[in-house]
C-alpha cells in the first residue's frame, strides 16, 4: 500500500532571497522590483492553483522565494494564526476551524470557487452514474455497505476518507451529507487529494471525494452525479449543483511586501483567465 501523504510540498527556489520587501501596489504590475519570501500551507484542494500562480509569479519576480505546503485547511489556518506561515489556504471560513479570537485577526482573500465531486473506482462506474442525495449520505455514513444496494455490482463499498482537519471534508459534510459525519476508514485516510485519487483508482469498490480541479484530464476515476446533476462548473454557476464553496487565502493582518504582491497577482485580471482552465470557478459568475 502506498504511503498516505498528509501534506504535499512544492518549493520554488529563489534566485536571490531578501528579507521584507517594500509593499507592491498591485503585485508585479506596479513595475517595482519585488523581493522576499512567501510561505503558505493548508488546503490541498487549492494547492494546484497556488502552485500554478506561484510559478507564473516567480517568472516575473525571480527574487521571490515561495514555499508551498498542503496539510489541510485546519493546519493552514492554525499556522497562519500562529505566524509560522504567511498565508493559510482554506476551503471553509476561518471561523469554522479556529476559536473566534484567533479567526478575528485574520484577513480573508477569496480567490475562487471550488466544486467538490464524489468519485468512484472505474469498476463501479459502468453501472453507477448517479446517486440520490439520500443514497450518497447512506453510503458515506455506512448505512449502505454494498454497491448492489444502490444499483451497482455485488461489491463491498470501500470508503476513502479524509481527516477532521480537512476543509474539503467540512464542506462535503455540510453540503453533501446534510451535516452527518462520514464513517471513518483510518486505513485509507488522507487529506492529500492526489493520494486519495490513487487510492480510489486502485481499490475495487472505492469511493471518495475531491475538488474538481483534480479531475481535469483525469480518467483514472469517475465522478458521480448527485440527483442526476453532474459536478461541472456550468452546473455550479447555474445553481443546480450544490456542493461547492469559496476558496480562501488568509493572512494575519493586511499583507505587505512579497506576500501582498503574490496575492494581488492571483486576484488580478491577468491571472483570472487561468482559473477556469484549472477547474476552479470565477466568483463573479456564481448565480445570485
Model segments located where?
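Bacterial N-terminal signal peptides that target proteins for export
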Residues: 1-4
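C-terminal motif of bacterial Sec signal peptides marking the signal peptidase cleavage site
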Residues: 12-16
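Exported/periplasmic ABC-transporter solute-binding proteins
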Residues: 18-74, 78-82, 86, 90-100, ...
Amino acid at each position: 500500500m502506498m504511503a498516505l501523504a498528509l501534506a504535499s510540498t512544492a518549493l520554488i527556489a529563489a534566485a536571490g532571497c531578501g528579507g521584507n520587501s517594500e509593499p507592491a501596489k498591485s503585485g508585479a504590475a506596479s513595475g517595482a522590483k519585488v523581493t522576499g519570501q512567501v510561505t503558505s500551507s493548508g488546503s490541498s484542494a487549492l494547492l494546484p492553483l497556488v502552485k500554478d500562480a506561484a510559478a507564473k509569479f516567480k517568472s516575473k519576480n525571480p527574487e521571490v522565494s515561495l514555499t508551498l505546503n498542503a496539510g489541510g485547511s485546519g493546519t493552514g489556518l492554525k499556522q497562519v494564526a500562529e505566524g509560522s506561515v504567511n498565508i493559510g489556504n482554506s476551503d471553509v471560513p476561518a471561523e469554522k476551524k479556529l476559536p473566534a479570537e484567533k479567526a478575528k485577526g485574520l484577513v480573508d482573500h477569496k480567490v475562487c470557487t471550488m466544486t467538490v465531486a464524489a468519485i468512484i473506482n472505474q469498476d463501479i462506474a459502468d453501472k453507477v452514474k448517479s446517486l440520490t442525495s439520500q443514497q450518497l449520505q447512506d453510503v458515506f455514513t455506512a448505512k449502505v455497505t454494498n454497491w448492489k444496494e444502490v444499483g451497482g455490482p455485488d461489491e463491498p463499498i470501500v470508503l476513502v476518507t479524509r481527516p477532521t482537519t480537512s476543509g474539503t471534508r467540512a464542506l462535503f459534510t455540510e453540503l453533501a451529507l446534510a451535516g452527518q459525519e462520514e464513517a471513518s476508514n483510518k486505513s485509507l485516510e488522507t487529506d492529500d487529494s492526489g493520494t486519495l485519487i490513487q487510492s480510489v483508482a486502485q481499490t475495487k469498490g472505492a469511493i471518495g471525494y475531491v475538488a474538481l480541479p483534480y479531475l481535469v484530464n483525469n480518467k483514472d476515476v469517475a465522478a458521480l452525479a448527485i440527483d442526476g446533476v453532474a459536478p461541472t462548473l456550468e452546473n455550479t454557476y447555474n445553481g443546480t449543483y450544490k456542493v461547492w464553496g469559496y476558496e480562501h487565502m488568509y493572512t494575519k493582518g493586511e499583507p505587505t511586501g512579497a506576500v501582498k504582491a503574490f496575492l494581488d497577482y492571483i486576484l488580478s485580471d491577468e491571472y483570472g483567465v487561468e482559473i477556469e482552465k484549472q477547474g476552479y470557478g470565477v466568483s463573479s459568475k456564481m448565480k445570485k
